């Protein structure tokens, strides 16, 4: 079968991967010369521990298996099973972590509460004051800025994959698509993985879909002269991941409100060390459109302050700052919007902040549902 994937981000690339793995011929079209959306503007986290019970957790766990398998085949994606530590610094945060590890599914998620000395033994770079840490051995990381090109190089070597950038698909045809150069590309099946681009062709074919857009701000430092053996989160991350909900989190929210900047920008701290030693740090969440086009300085000052307090030292100079927009299903409990929009076409979008984590498993399910 000839499969045409519209969209060059990680979700589209994983659909191409799944189709090629099943022996099909794939053409992947991207309107930019390279992916420029959320797929290259994120942490590269494969984040399992904080996922909601049920479909979301199962999808993340399956995706974690697939990422490890892909990492063995394509070392260039930078997969490493480094785990994560959510650093707890107050009694209320410690109560949340204690509540979570006491639940029946804690071991299945890879969660364990560590004492301060155990935290520093696991990740000596965490030199700040702390009461402990929630360790998730299931979490992992990849390199978001190079993962898609590395995957494409592997796919190209199969002889059954073609990459066509700089083309915007303008029309869905009974046997393929037409692009903005006027060229027609034949296909038995079209998979639209267009990310946060929900207008134009997507709106024309699918109408209004139950997906909203979310804007974030992040940054990256110069290389740190120390190795972080895990990804790192602060206690504010408990507020943003469904696995941590419960009476202890209610008490945290009531008695330990976020700082004004963190609350205004709906912030948590996540920190991942890249393979070159630099640190990717974020992030903010903005939900109300039209989004501002400014990159605000206050969130960055907050992130620097929190990161330095966790590390117990000054950060290296900030190398770059950026904003990004991703698509999220309007129902937070729904992993992705997947819909058949024509006899020969599916739309797959809106995984939200779980897109980098879950994309391999989302794609695997799509190709099964589409009969590949």
Residue ranges with predicted function:
Residues 76-88, 113, 120-158, 284-288, ...:
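Helix-loop-beta segment of a Rossmann-like dinucleotide-binding subdomain
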Residues 9-10, 33, 353:
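Residue-level detector of alpha-helix initiation sites
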Residues 2-27:
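N-terminal Rossmann-like FAD-binding beta1-loop-alpha1 element of flavoenzymes
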Residues 162-176:
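A conserved short coil-to-beta-strand element within the FAD-binding core of flavoproteins
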Residues 266-268, 274-280, 286-372:
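C-terminal catalytic lobe of FAD-dependent flavoproteins
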Residues 183-273, 289, 293:
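Flavin-dependent oxidoreductases
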Residues 21-40:
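Glycine-rich FAD pyrophosphate-binding loop
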Residues 43-122:
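Dinucleotide-binding Rossmann-like beta1-alpha1 core, especially the glycine-rich loop
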């Amino acid at each position: 079968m000839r499969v045409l994937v519209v969209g060059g981000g990680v979700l589209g690339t994983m659909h191409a991967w799944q189709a090629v793995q099943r022996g099909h011929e794939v053409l992947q079209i991207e309107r930019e010369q390279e992916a420029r959306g959320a797929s290259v503007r994120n942490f590269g986290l494969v984040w399992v521990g904080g996922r909601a019970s049920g479909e979301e957790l199962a999808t993340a766990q399956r995706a974690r298996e697939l990422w490890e398998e892909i990492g063995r085949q394509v070392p260039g994606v930078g997969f490493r099973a480094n785990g994560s530590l959510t650093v707890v610094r107050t009694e209320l945060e410690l109560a949340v972590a204690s509540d979570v590890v006491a639940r029946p599914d804690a071991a299945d998620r890879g969660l364990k509460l560590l004492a301060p000395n155990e935290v520093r033994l696991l990740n000596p770079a965490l030199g700040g004051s702390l009461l402990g840490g929630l360790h998730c051995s299931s979490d992992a990381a990849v390199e978001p800025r190079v993962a898609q090109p590395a995957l494409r190089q592997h796919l190209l070597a199969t002889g059954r994959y073609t990459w066509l950038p700089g083309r915007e698909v303008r029309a869905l045809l009974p046997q393929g698509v037409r692009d903005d150069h006027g060229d027609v590309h034949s296909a038995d099946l079209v998979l639209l993985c267009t990310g946060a681009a929900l207008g134009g062709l997507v709106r024309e074919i699918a109408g209004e879909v139950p997906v909203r857009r979310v804007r974030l701000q992040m940054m990256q430092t110069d290389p740190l002269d120390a190795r972080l053996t895990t990804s790192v989160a602060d206690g504010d991350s408990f507020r943003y991941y469904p696995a941590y909900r419960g009476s202890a989190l209610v008490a945290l929210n009531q008695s330990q409100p976020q700082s004004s900047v963190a609350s205004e920008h709906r912030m948590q701290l996540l920190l991942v060390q890249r393979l070159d030693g630099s640190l990717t740090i974020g992030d903010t969440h903005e939900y109300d459109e039209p989004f501002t086009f400014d990159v605000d300085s206050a969130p960055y000052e907050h992130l620097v302050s929190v990161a330095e307090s966790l590390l117990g030292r000054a950060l290296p100079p900030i190398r770059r700052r950026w904003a990004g927009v991703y698509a999220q299903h309007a129902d937070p409990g729904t992993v992705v919007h997947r819909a058949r929009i024509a006899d020969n076409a599916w739309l797959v979008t809106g995984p939200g902040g779980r897109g980098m984590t879950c994309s391999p498993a989302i794609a695997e399910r799509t190709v099964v549902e589409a009969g590949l």
